[in-house]
Amino acid sequence: MPLAFAMALDVPVADLLAAIGHDGGEIVFPSLPEPLCRRCFHVQELIQVALARGFAVTPIELFPVLQPTEIGPFHKTVLYTDNNWRRFEAAIQTSRGVVDGTGARLGHTVAYDHGRIYDPRGPVYDYSRLACEAHQFYTRCAWRIDPVGERACE
């Protein structure tokens, strides 16, 4: 996650980690296997760094879910009349930020800039659902990064 945010914010990874105050490597759940035992990062830590640099981070969830309680069987996916995939793609095509989802085994994040995906693992490609899935990346949420105080143009 920090690599993708560093790419989207155009800051060196070392500077981003210094601003967060840790590298995510501390073992905090010793009973779990690698890499689940590691501290890693919460998106709020990265949002705080972005805010300190004058950027707002707004989530655009692919399939938002209504859920009356934190636990329990009740939930309802929000389906948009103009299609959730089109809405999600429009956000990626018209802004820059980070997309989180799952990779082949665990969570994964990539940076994006107006429809172009920059994967910290190396690949650079144009965004589409099929292109992401061809790279074994299954999207969940776009974190749009915009300068604070500027009105977004769609």
Name the predicted role of every residue range.
Residues I27-G107, Y112-G122, S128-E133:
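Conserved active-site-adjacent core of cysteine acyl-enzyme catalytic domains
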